[in-house]
Swiss-Prot record:
At 24 hours post-fertilization, expressed in most tissues, with strongest expression in the brain and somites. It holds the Pfam family Aida_C2. Residues 25-51 form a coiled coil. Belongs to the AIDA family. This is Axin interactor, dorsalization-associated protein.
């Protein structure tokens, strides 16, 4: 069997897995499977080096990815009627199974899913509000999107005599709807009292495990300045972000922060606050009254 046939077989198996989860009512697993397959198809469509598929076939794969995203969005939107039903999605099985020979018109009037856009800090909150306002009227246009890289964590700085470095292990975050979050990651930044960056901003990779009300990261973040060199009033911020397929952008769901007097070796849990992220720490509103927090572990390195 050729590589391209193996790829198609793998896609078909993934599609079957997703629709099976969907029909069994295992919606979180179905959403995850649909999202994984949509990413794989998008990657193939966007690859300029791939010659396994014709341009027409790539266009069909792009439309297929759109339908997967639409079904994912429908499963997450419990307030309204499903926009894209499971029986509609199942009609597409012959396409993914026989993409190399499929030559009929695509059964639904959809466009290939656009590339994702990564928004500048604060921009996602503005767009979030605009999208919410537009949702009722159908107004607004879809932005273009570019793929997000899998994390941007930096290595530990070289040690200096008498200076202290901090490693923060992000263990997990507690959220009541943890299982519904798509491609969750955390942006870590260090700000002064005026909200100005003191260090390079770092993104964790996307979390790999969800369990009950927790999303597990288990990832080390190296703070990019010796603690003795941080100004008075500085704080370390953690912005929890996730992808919204219906709105097609990455949004900040909540944030947390640590002040300098909280830096000490060992575990710590910190409270979660509602967006938009308030880097100046003036107007803080707790995300929930439930005992859900960001769980960290701190390691200090001193020569």
């Amino acid at each position: 069997m050729s590589d391209v046939n193996k790829t198609v077989q793998k896609w078909h198996a993934s599609f079957k897995k997703g629709t099976d989860f969907d029909s069994w009512g295992q919606l979180v697993e179905a959403i995850d499977e649909y999202q994984i397959l949509a990413r794989q198809l998008q990657k193939e469509v966007q690859s300029s080096n791939s010659h396994d598929f014709t341009e027409e076939q790539k266009k069909t794969l792009g439309k297929f990815a759109t339908c997967l995203e639409m079904r994912s969005a429908a499963l997450q939107c419990t307030q309204s009627q499903e926009e894209f039903k499971l029986e509609d999605l199942k009609k597409l099985e012959p396409i993914i199974k026989n993409i190399l020979t499929y030559n009929k018109d695509f059964p639904f009037d959809v466009q290939p899913v656009p590339l994702r856009k990564i928004l500048a800090p604060g921009e996602e909150e503005n767009l979030d509000v605009e999208e919410d306002l537009d949702a009722g009227t159908g107004a607004g246009s879809t932005p273009s999107f570019t793929s997000r890289l899998p994390g941007s964590l930096l290595p530990r700085l070289p040690s200096e005599p008498g200076m202290t470095l901090l490693t923060l292990t992000i263990e997990k975050i507690g959220l009541k709807d943890a299982g519904q979050c798509i491609d969750p990651y955390i942006t870590v930044s260090v700000k002064d009292l005026n909200g100005i960056d003191l260090n390079p901003v770092q993104d964790t990779p996307v979390a790999t495990r969800k369990e009950d009300t927790y999303i597990h990261f288990s990832v080390d973040v190296e703070i990019q300045r010796h603690l003795e060199k941080l100004p008075k009033g500085a704080a370390i911020f953690f912005e929890f972000k996730h992808y919204k397929p219906k709105k097609r952008f990455t949004s900040t769901k909540c944030f947390a922060f640590m002040e300098m007097d909280e830096i000490k070796p060992g575990p710590i849990v910190i409270e979660l606050y509602k967006k938009p992220t308030d880097f100046k720490r003036k107007k803080l509103n707790l995300l929930t009254k439930k005992p859900l927090y960001l769980h960290l572990n701190q390691t200090l390195h001193k020569d």
